[in-house]
């Protein structure tokens, strides 16, 4: 595909938006999925104040703005703000005219039908896209790992899903959703650090804790054993320098926060951990394909980036599964962006080019066309 007609691939996550061109091996733009509006009108006189800010700009001006996340738990809940994010993606980040490029968007598993239609409508009517496609995030992650069958554990900032996929098709009856993800772990780490006497209260400080989480946290293979080790020596302690120069020490918080993925009770949630949820998802599938699923458990999303998570997952899932089963956890190093990468691969396949939903088809059939063309 020549560069001028390269398709655009946009993966809209609850926390970050990833965007770029089909055929590239990584997204060109990665920015927070936030829209900020000034708290007080006319405070910044002469600043040429805008009525809204998106992404990094909203993040850097957050002191004077009210921030909103238009995507909650993976699902778009505020379409006006979502439109602003897409506008920002096309015109400010990628600097392209959307009417000149096919657009591939991603959606959460179990996204309501009305939502897919709304997405389709906005792309064709507001942005005049020549062609459009919407793909399920977890399916793209599986493609990115070079598979068409497997179960994807996709955990981002706002939501976690287990999605069994057979021969390229997600099995909706067996998809499970867990409302526990990166944002909750950051909150939990804030709580743990409070107990140590380090208060983090503002949204700015919350970003610092997210950074601590990403740099220092890991998943213990044996939680109780790790707690004992941490209590008996300072071997597991690490220090972190705050922006103001203060240095804080963090010990068992390093593995206590991510442990909530396996023990949601830590957060007061009556949910199954990610290992049990994966097992339950597999159990809802046909007996004949379970072996293929156990042997292809693919991790995807930023919240699966903790060191030690694959080994722990291997251990827990093996303990739950029938003894004859071979469990294999696949943790690609680029899994933070594997949804986007899968989209880039799909949209640049020559065999995919006749699967796009065109503007003409949309004009003839309306938004419902998306259910017939994209599945």
From Swiss-Prot:
SMART domains: ACTIN (SM00268)
One Gene Ontology term of the molecular function aspect: hydrolase activity
InterPro entries: Actin, Actin/actin-like_CS, Actin_CS, ATPase_NBD
Keyword tags: ATP-binding, Cytoplasm, Cytoskeleton, Hydrolase, Nucleotide-binding
EC code(s) of this entry: 3.6.4.-
Pfam family of the protein (one): Actin
Superkingdom assignment: Eukaryota
CDD domains: ASKHA_NBD_actin
Catalytic reactions of this protein: ATP + H2O = ADP + phosphate + H(+)
Cell location: Cytoplasm, Cytoskeleton
A GO CC term assigned to this protein in UniProt: cytoplasm
Enzyme class, UniProt record, top EC level: hydrolase
Annotated function: Actins are highly conserved proteins that are involved in various types of cell motility and are ubiquitously expressed in all eukaryotic cells.
Protein family per UniProt: Belongs to the actin family.
Protein name per Swiss-Prot or TrEMBL: Actin-1
Naturally occurring in which organism (per UniProt): Schizophyllum commune (Split gill fungus)
